[in-house]
Curated annotation (Swiss-Prot):
Location(s) in or outside the cell: Cytoplasm
UniProt organism field: Yersinia pseudotuberculosis serotype O:3 (strain YPIII)
Gene: pfkA
Pathway membership, UniProt: Carbohydrate degradation; glycolysis; D-glyceraldehyde 3-phosphate and glycerone phosphate from D-glucose: step 3/4
Keywords carried by this UniProt record: Allosteric enzyme, ATP-binding, Cytoplasm, Glycolysis, Kinase, Magnesium, Metal-binding, Nucleotide-binding, Transferase
Role, per record: Catalyzes the phosphorylation of D-fructose 6-phosphate to fructose 1,6-bisphosphate by ATP, the first committing step of glycolysis.
Position of the signal peptide: none
Gene Ontology CC annotation, any one: 6-phosphofructokinase complex
Active-site residues, as the UniProt record annotates them: 129
Annotated positions binding ADP: 22-26, 55-60, 156, 187-189, 213, 215-217
Record GO terms (molecular function): 6-phosphofructokinase activity; AMP binding; ATP binding; fructose-6-phosphate binding; identical protein binding; metal ion binding; monosaccharide binding
Protein name per its UniProtKB record: ATP-dependent 6-phosphofructokinase
């Protein structure tokens, strides 16, 4: 059984990460474990920037956005020699367990620490993209969804006033879950996501069909990287004759106080991660990751969830069908 654990946040920040850290710390202390907070993710692990945490270290954190431990992208961690330094830093402090909060890249780093150094690692899915396998939802997704929907509501006000077409670019990388959910909740007329082949002419045809039905304005929700928003706006305006403007929401989607569901999810996952570390699991095959499925906490080997065939969360086809019916 582990006696000392570390906790870090890695990759892009997500609302609810602080709540997850709090869940880990409070649950670990209740079990009599020592807890070290590692600053700036794997970079801090490599640079030996760790501090012992107590109950008061995480007071008033459940409602705060971002991550008070800090986060950083550290591609150098792929180097085995860099990982050896990180492992040495943990071994010298007697840390034998680690909770990593982040996406699939963060999971991969945790799995290597388990396989190469015997550290019992558990990953928690912290990303607004909802693109991690093994879980229905990730920490931060629902808060980002609220942010996007609020922006869509505001854009609808001005779009309807000017009978304009508005394009909203939503984060998500190669996963359209955030765009899809926001399109349904925001009543968007059109949607473009990575899971469905995107063609400009098809989108224009749909918009023209809407105009023919009497639509005076429209909101198009599109996942980042599918197209250049400014160029797409000009193309739509040229083809339809309707004024069209693009809005990139950007990093505002990552900020803000986490909504209640994210706080609950993060707290449950943090506590469950400690339970896993206290149980007599076999870590010879690698670390584990935590998820929520049908509102129940579950876990799986990290290697299974980051395998190429499982790396991305499943496409919510029923959500897409619903969205299309409501356009």
């Amino acid at each position: 059984m582990v006696k000392k654990i570390g906790v870090l946040t890695s990759g892009g920040d997500a609302p609810g990460m602080n709540a997850a850290i709090r869940g880990v710390v409070r649950a670990a202390l209740s079990a009599g474990l020592d807890v070290f907070g590692i600053e700036d993710g794997y970079l801090g692990l490599y640079e030996n920037r760790m501090k012992k945490l107590d109950r008061y270290s995480v007071s008033d954190m459940i409602n705060r956005g971002g991550t008070f431990l800090g986060s950083a992208r550290f591609p150098e961690f792929r180097d085995p020699e860099v990982r050896k330094v990180a492992l040495k830093n943990m071994h010298e402090r007697g840390i034998d367990g680690l909770v990593v909060i982040g996406g699939d890249g963060s999971y991969a780093g945790a799995d290597l620490l388990t396989k190469e150094g015997g550290i019992h690692c558990v990953g928690l899915p912290g990303t607004i993209d909802n693109d991690v396998a093994g879980t229905d939802y990730t920490i931060g997704f629902f808060t980002a969804l609220e942010t996007v929907v609020e922006a869509i509501d505001r854009l609808r006000d001005t779009s309807s006033s000017h009978q304009r077409i508005s394009i909203v670019e939503v984060m998500g990388r190669y996963c359209g879950d955030l765009t899809l959910a926001a399109a349904i909740a925001g009543g968007c007329e059109f949607i473009a996501i990575p899971e469905v082949e995107f063609k400009r002419d098809d989108l224009v045809a749909e918009i023209k069909a809407g105009i023919a039905k009497g639509k005076k304005h429209a909101i198009v929700a599109i996942t980042e990287k599918l197209d250049d928003i400014d160029s797409l706006a000009k193309y739509i305006e040229k083809e339809t004759g309707r004024e069209t403007r693009g809005t990139v929401l950007g990093h505002i989607q990552r900020g803000g106080a986490p909504v209640a569901y994210d706080r609950i999810l993060a707290s449950r996952m943090g506590s469950y991660a400690v339970d896993l570390l206290l149980q007599d699991h076999d870590y010879k095959k690698g670390g584990f990751c935590v998820g929520v499925q049908n509102e129940k906490m579950v876990h799986e080997l990290i290697s299974v969830c980051i395998a190429p065939e499982n790396k991305k969360s499943k496409f919510k086809e029923d959500w897409y069908d619903t969205a299309k019916k409501l356009f």
